[in-house]
A protein has these predicted regions:
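ABC transporter TMD-NBD coupling linker
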Residues: 132-142
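Hydrophobic alpha-helical transmembrane segments of small proteolipidic membrane proteins, enriched
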Residues: 1-134
Length: 142
């Protein structure tokens, strides 16, 4: 087992993916806000077409919100695996080393939560805006 490769995977792979997911969710949230601000819902003759336009890219934000926690958990599990492997290889149980390694392993879960919580807030905010836009269209077209 190549421990150095696993450490790099956790540090750059898992954490890099989580940071990227955070930027993607923020980008699509801002993009949707600009789209909703400039949208004239009355220019749509069919409600389904309006709904398709309104919900575009929201599933990406929802997927990021739900999956970033699991990606963070994967990083933590890999970090704990590395800690136990290194303990087994050295044959020594040093509490300082174990606690430091476990603390670094938990950073992946923490980052996963840091990405997931705002993404879920973004998604819920957009869903509310979608409901309002659809209701306004319904009021004007019924």
């Amino acid at each position: 087992m190549n421990i150095d490769l696993m450490k790099l995977t956790v540090d750059y792979g898992i954490l890099g993916i989580l940071i990227f997911m955070g930027f993607v969710s923020l980008f699509f949230y801002i993009e949707r806000l600009f789209f909703y601000k400039n949208l004239d819902e009355q220019s749509y003759s069919k409600k389904d077409l309006l709904e398709i336009e309104l919900t575009n890219n929201t599933s990406i934000i929802a997927s990021i919100a739900s999956n970033s926690v699991y990606i963070g958990l994967l990083g933590t599990v890999m970090g704990i695996l590395i800690t136990f492997y290194e303990m087994g290889q050295t044959g020594q149980i040093d509490v300082k080393i174990i606690m430091t390694s476990l603390a670094f392993a938990l950073k992946a879960t923490a980052l996963g939560l840091v990405v997931a919580i705002p993404a879920m807030m973004f998604y819920n905010h957009l869903v509310r805006k979608i409901e309002v836009k659809l209701a306004l269209w319904q009021i004007h077209n019924s």
